[in-house]
From Swiss-Prot:
Homodimer. This is Uroporphyrinogen decarboxylase. It catalyses: uroporphyrinogen III + 4 H(+) = coproporphyrinogen III + 4 CO2. Its EC number is 4.1.1.37. Belongs to the uroporphyrinogen decarboxylase family. It comes from the Bacteria. The record marks D72 as: Transition state stabilizer. GO terms for molecular function: uroporphyrinogen decarboxylase activity.
Length: 346
C-alpha cells in the first residue's frame, strides 16, 4: 500500500500506521558513510545522483512507507542572498550573521527554479523510483528556525542574539521572518510540483519560545507559509515538527497544518487529547533504538497503542542517532509492520 502514509496524513483509519524515520538517510548506515568519505555534504545534497542514491538507501534496506528528500533546511538560503557554509560535524556557519536593517533589506525573494534546479531533478527521480511503493516527502525549514541560524550565525544554546532582536527591535525581526516565509512558501510549492506528496516543515527551535512568544514569532509565519501553499495545493498534507513542543500543543493547529510531529518528551495519549482532530506523527525516543529488541518492540507498540488507528504516522521524536545499529532499525520497522497483529496478541 504505497499511499499508506498519505492516507494517514489525511486522517484516515488504518490497520497499522505507516512508518518512516527523521534522518533515515544518514550516518548510522554504512552505505551512507562510504559516500560521506568521498563527497562533501554540499555535494551529497546538490548532486542529483548522490542525493537520490542517499534518499533510496534506507528505502532499499528497510522499506519505509515514506521516502524523504535528502537535503538540508538551509539549502534555499543562498538563493535568497544568505551565504552559508556547512562544516562537517560542526553544522552550518553563517558569517556575517544577519542582524541589521541593511542586511535584511538585501535578502531576495527565492526563485527556486533558478537557484535550486537540482531539487526538482532529485524529487522527480525519487517519485519515479518509489511510485506505488512509498509516499515521497519533501521538507523545509520554518522561518523562526531559519532565522535562528541566520541571526545567531551558527547553532546556539541560549538564542541570545535573535531574542535580543525580537525584544529590542521587533519590527526588524518581523520583516526578516515575513521575507523568509514568502520564500519558503515558494520552496514548498516548488517541491510539490517536483513530485513531493507530503511536505514537512521543521520549526525545530520554536520549542525554545514561551507560548506567548511562539504566537508572536513562530506561529504567524508558519501560517503564512501554509496559507500560500494551501491556496495552490489544498490536497497536499503539511506536517509541522517542533522539538520541545509540550507547552505549545493547543496552539500548533492554528498554523493550518494537517499533521503535527511530536517529540518524545510528551506522552502520546495526552498529546492526542490536546491536539484535537490533528493527525499526529511520532514519537519514539530515538535512543530507544539503542536498546534490546524486546525493549524496542515494547516501546514501539506502546506508542502505536496510545496513538490509536486514526491519522497516525509512526516515527521517532527526533532524528535517528548516528550510533544506532542498522539491525535495530530493521527490527523497529518490522515491529511497526506487524503491529496490528502484535497489539492484538498482547
Amino acid at each position: 500500500m504505497g499511499d499508506r502514509l498519505l492516507r494517514a496524513a489525511r486522517g484516515e483509519v488504518l490497520d497499522r500506521p505507516p512508518v518512516w524515520m527523521m534522518r533515515q538517510a544518514g550516518r548510522y548506515m554504512a552505505a551512507y558513510r562510504e559516500l560521506q568519505s568521498k563527497y562533501t555534504f554540499k555535494q551529497r545534497c546538490e548532486i542529483p545522483e548522490l542525493a537520490v542514491e542517499i534518499s533510496l538507501q534506507p528505502f532499499r534496506a528497510f522499506a519505509p512507507d515514506g521516502v524523504i528528500l535528502f537535503s538540508d533546511i538551509l539549502t534555499p538560503l543562498e538563493g535568497m542572498g544568505i551565504p552559508f557554509e556547512l562544516v562537517e560535524h560542526q553544522g552550518p556557519i553563517i558569517d556575517p550573521p544577519i542582524r541589521s536593517q541593511a542586511q535584511i533589506e538585501r535578502i531576495r525573494l527565492l526563485e527556486p527554479e533558478e537557484s535550486l534546479p537540482f531539487i526538482k531533478t532529485i524529487l522527480s527521480t525519487l517519485r519515479r523510483e518509489v511510485e506505488g511503493k512509498a509516499t515521497l516527502l519533501g521538507f523545509v525549514g520554518s522561518p523562526w528556525t531559519l532565522a535562528c541560524y541566520a541571526v545567531e550565525g551558527r547553532s546556539s544554546k541560549d538564542y541570545a542574539h535573535i531574542k535580543s532582536l525580537a525584544f529590542a527591535q521587533p519590527p526588524l525581526l518581523h520583516q526578516l521572518l515575513s521575507k523568509l516565509a514568502d520564500s519558503i512558501a515558494r520552496y514548498v510549492i516548488y517541491q510539490i510540483e517536483g513530485g513531493a506528496q507530503v511536505v514537512q516543515l521543521f520549526d525545530t527551535w520554536a520549542g525554545q519560545l514561551s507560548p506567548v512568544d511562539y504566537e508572536c514569532w513562530a506561529l504567524p509565519y508558519q501560517k503564512q507559509i501554509v496559507d500560500q501553499v494551501k491556496a495552490r495545493y489544498p490536497q497536499v498534507p503539511l506536517i509541522l515538527y517542533i522539538n520541545g513542543s509540550a507547552a505549545l500543543l493547543e496552539r500548533v493547529g492554528k498554523a493550518g497544518i494537517d499533521v503535527f510531529s511530536l517529540d518524545w518528551m510528551s506522552d502520546m495519549a495526552e498529546a492526542r487529547a490536546r491536539l484535537g482532530s490533528l493527525a499526529v506523527q511520532g514519537n519514539l525516543d530515538p535512543m530507544v533504538l539503542l536498546g534490546s529488541p524486546e525493549f524496542i518492540r515494547q516501546r514501539t507498540l506502546e506508542v502505536i497503542r496510545k496513538a490509536g488507528s486514526r491519522g497516525h504516522i509512526m516515527n521517532l521524536g527526533h532524528g535517528i542517532h548516528p550510533s544506532t545499529p542498522e539491525a535495530n532499525v530493521h527490527y523497529f520497522f518490522e515491529t511497526v509492520r506487524q503491529s496490528a497483529e502484535l497489539i492484538h496478541l498482547r
